[in-house]
C-alpha cells in the first residue's frame, strides 16, 4: 500500500500543518505531566465498581440510558453538597470528559462566523476546540504575572463582542485563580455566554462560580471534571452546570447515546465514594505547599497555585530544562510558555524525586 501523509488527503485547509494534542506518554520512574490524582481508587470503590460492571455487562446488547438522568442526579447532589447551591439534574449535563462538554458547547454556541475569546496562556484545548468547530479564537493575553488583566479583558470583550468567553479558574497551566468579582465584571459586559472552566476547583479555596448562576441565567456555564480530584481520569467524565435551557441547547448537537452504559455506572460508583476519594485532596494540597517551598528555596520563580500542579521557572530554554528533568527519570510538562514548566503534585516519594532533580536542574539552568 502506498505511503500517505496528511498532505495527500483532502482535509480542511486550516488543519494542514497542525499537530495533534497530547502530552508525552513515556515509561519513566516519575510521571508528573498530566495533572492526575496519583492516589489509586480505594479497595471499596474498586470492589463495588467490579460488581456493578458485572451487572451491567448482561445488558450490553442494549443502548445505554440516553440522557444519563441517574448520573446527572448524582452529580447534582454532589454539586449541591460541595457548593451549597441547590442544583437539580435538569441544570446539569455530562459527557466523556470536560473536553466533550466544551466541544458540545462550542458546537451549539460557536461555529462559522462566531468568535470565542480566551486569556492565554490557559488550557490549550480551548483554541483547538475552537478550530475544530470553526469558531474564531481571539486571545486576550494575560499580564506579566499570568493573571487576567481586568481592564484589558473588559476592553477586549467590548471591542470584539465575542459569542463565547472562556475563563479558567484555577487556570491551567499557571494554577492561579480568577476572583468572583472579576468573573462578574466579565459577565456584565459579555454579549454572549461565559464558560467558567473549573476543572481544578476541588483544590481551591475560592467559592465556585456556580454561586453566580441565579444572577446570570442566560450567560453563565460552569464546567467541571472528574478527571482530577476525583481520581477518575481513566473514566473520562466531565459535566457542566447552567440553566436548564443550556442542556436543551447541547442536546441539539450531542451524538446519540454518547455516554456508554459502563461509563455512567462507573461514574455513579465514584460519586458514591466521593468522601473517601476527595480525602486525598488535602494530602495533595499539603504536598503542593511543601514542593512549592522547596522550589522557592532552590531559587525558582513560582506562580501561586490553587491547583494540583506548580508552574515554575525562569529558564532561558525551558525545553532544555524539561529534557534535563527527563534525563533524571522525571517527566513533567513543557506547555510551550517561554521560560516556564509545569509539574503535577504527586505522591510524597514522587515529589521527593522531583525536588532532587530540580536541585540539579537549578544548578545547571538558573
From Swiss-Prot:
Keyword Amino-acid biosynthesis part of the UniProt annotation: yes
Modified residues (N6-(pyridoxal phosphate)lysine): 228
Tagged with keyword Transferase: yes
Superkingdom, natural source: Bacteria
Pathway(s) the chain acts in: Amino-acid biosynthesis; L-histidine biosynthesis; L-histidine from 5-phospho-alpha-D-ribose 1-diphosphate: step 7/9
EC numbers for this chain: 2.6.1.9
A single MF term (Gene Ontology): histidinol-phosphate transaminase activity
Catalytic activity entry: L-histidinol phosphate + 2-oxoglutarate = 3-(imidazol-4-yl)-2-oxopropyl phosphate + L-glutamate
Top EC class for this record: transferase
Cofactor(s) recorded in Swiss-Prot or TrEMBL: pyridoxal 5'-phosphate
Keywords noted in UniProt: Amino-acid biosynthesis, Aminotransferase, Histidine biosynthesis, Pyridoxal phosphate, Transferase
GO biological process: L-histidine biosynthetic process
Subunit structure: Homodimer.
Family: Belongs to the class-II pyridoxal-phosphate-dependent aminotransferase family. Histidinol-phosphate aminotransferase subfamily.
Name this protein carries in UniProt: Histidinol-phosphate aminotransferase
Organism of this sequence: Corynebacterium diphtheriae (strain ATCC 700971 / NCTC 13129 / Biotype gravis)
Amino acid at each position: 500500500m502506498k505511503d500517505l501523509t496528511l498532505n495527500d488527503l483532502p482535509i480542511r485547509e486550516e488543519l494542514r500543518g497542525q499537530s495533534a494534542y497530547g502530552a508525552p506518554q513515556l515509561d519513566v520512574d516519575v510521571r508528573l505531566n498530566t495533572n492526575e490524582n496519583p492516589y489509586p481508587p480505594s479497595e471499596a470503590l474498586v470492589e463495588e465498581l467490579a460488581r456493578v460492571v458485572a451487572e451491567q455487562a448482561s445488558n450490553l446488547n442494549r443502548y445505554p440510558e440516553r440522557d444519563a438522568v441517574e448520573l446527572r442526579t448524582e452529580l447534582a447532589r454532589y454539586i449541591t453538597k460541595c457548593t451549597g447551591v441547590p442544583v437539580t439534574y435538569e441544570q446539569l449535563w455530562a459527557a466523556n470528559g470536560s473536553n466533550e462538554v466544551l466541544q458540545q458547547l462550542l458546537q451549539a454556541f460557536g461555529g462559522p462566523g462566531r468568535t470565542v475569546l480566551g486569556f492565554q496562556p490557559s488550557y490549550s484545548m480551548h483554541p483547538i476546540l475552537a478550530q475544530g468547530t470553526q469558531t474564531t479564537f481571539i486571545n486576550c493575553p494575560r499580564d506579566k504575572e499570568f493573571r487576567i488583566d481586568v481592564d484589558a479583558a473588559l476592553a477586549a470583550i467590548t471591542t470584539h463582542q465575542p459569542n463565547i468567553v472562556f475563563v479558567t479558574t484555577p487556570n491551567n497551566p499557571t494554577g492561579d485563580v480568577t476572583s468572583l468579582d472579576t468573573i462578574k465584571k466579565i459577565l456584565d459586559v459579555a454579549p454572549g455566554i461565559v464558560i467558567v472552566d473549573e476543572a481544578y476547583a476541588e483544590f481551591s479555596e475560592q467559592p465556585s462560580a456556580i454561586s453566580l448562576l441565579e444572577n446570570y441565567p442566560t450567560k453563565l456555564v460552569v464546567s467541571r471534571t472528574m478527571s482530577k480530584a476525583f481520581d477518575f481520569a481513566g473514566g473520562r467524565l466531565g459535566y457542566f452546570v447552567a440553566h436548564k435551557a443550556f442542556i436543551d441547547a447541547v442536546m441539539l448537537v450531542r451524538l446519540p447515546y454518547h455516554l456508554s452504559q459502563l461509563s455512567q455506572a462507573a461514574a455513579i460508583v465514584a460519586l458514591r465514594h466521593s468522601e473517601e476519594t476527595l480525602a486525598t485532596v488535602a494530602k495533595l494540597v499539603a504536598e503542593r505547599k511543601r514542593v512549592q517551598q522547596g522550589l522557592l528555596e532552590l531559587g525558582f520563580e513560582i506562580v501561586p497555585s490553587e491547583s494540583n500542579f506548580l508552574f515554575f521557572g525562569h529558564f532561558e530554554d525551558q525545553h532544555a530544562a524539561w529534557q534535563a528533568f527527563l534525563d533524571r527519570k522525571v517527566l513533567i510538562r513543557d506547555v510551550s510558555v517561554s521560560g516556564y514548566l509545569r509539574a503535577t503534585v504527586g505522591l510524597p516519594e514522587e515529589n521527593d524525586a522531583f525536588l532532587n532533580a530540580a536541585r540539579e536542574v537549578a544548578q545547571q539552568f538558573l
